Amino acid sequence: MRGSSNKKIDPRIHYLVPKHEVLNIDEAYKILKELGIRPEQLPWIRASDPVARSINAKPGDIIRIIRKSQLYGEVVSYRYVISG
């Protein structure tokens, strides 16, 4: 067994992990209004997810995820943060 270390690995630095960002209230309201949905209707992400923890997302927040795609350039998706 290796010696324990307090180092924390930031999952956001891996090249396969897309950019995640927490939306502010105004941005979240605008997105929900454009889509015509309630926050609970978005796909969910748990607050315990490594990336959600690294960006300090809390239950009730909405996260914007920006993925790079060879076919479409950038693909934007949203997730609603739930407890767990």
Swiss-Prot record:
Compartments where found: Cytoplasm
A single Gene Ontology CC term: cytoplasm
Name of the gene encoding the protein in the UniProt record: rpo5
PANTHER family recorded: DNA-DIRECTED RNA POLYMERASES I, II, AND III SUBUNIT RPABC1
InterPro entries to which the protein is assigned, alphabetical: Arch_Rpo5/euc_Rpb5 (IPR014381), RNA_pol_subH/Rpb5_C (IPR000783), RNA_pol_subH/Rpb5_CS (IPR020608), RPB5-like_sf (IPR035913)
Record text on subunit structure and interactions: Part of the 13-subunit RNA polymerase complex.
Protein function: DNA-dependent RNA polymerase (RNAP) catalyzes the transcription of DNA into RNA using the four ribonucleoside triphosphates as substrates.
Protein name: DNA-directed RNA polymerase subunit Rpo5
Similarity field: Belongs to the archaeal Rpo5/eukaryotic RPB5 RNA polymerase subunit family.
UniProt keyword terms in alphabetical order: Cytoplasm, DNA-directed RNA polymerase, Nucleotidyltransferase, Transcription, Transferase
SUPFAM superfamilies cross-referenced by the UniProt entry: RPB5-like RNA polymerase subunit
GO biological process, one term: DNA-templated transcription
Catalytic activity: RNA(n) + a ribonucleoside 5'-triphosphate = RNA(n+1) + diphosphate
Family matches, as Pfam families: RNA_pol_Rpb5_C (PF01191)
Entry EC number(s): 2.7.7.6
Originating organism: Saccharolobus solfataricus (strain ATCC 35092 / DSM 1617 / JCM 11322 / P2)
Entry GO MF terms: DNA binding; DNA-directed RNA polymerase activity
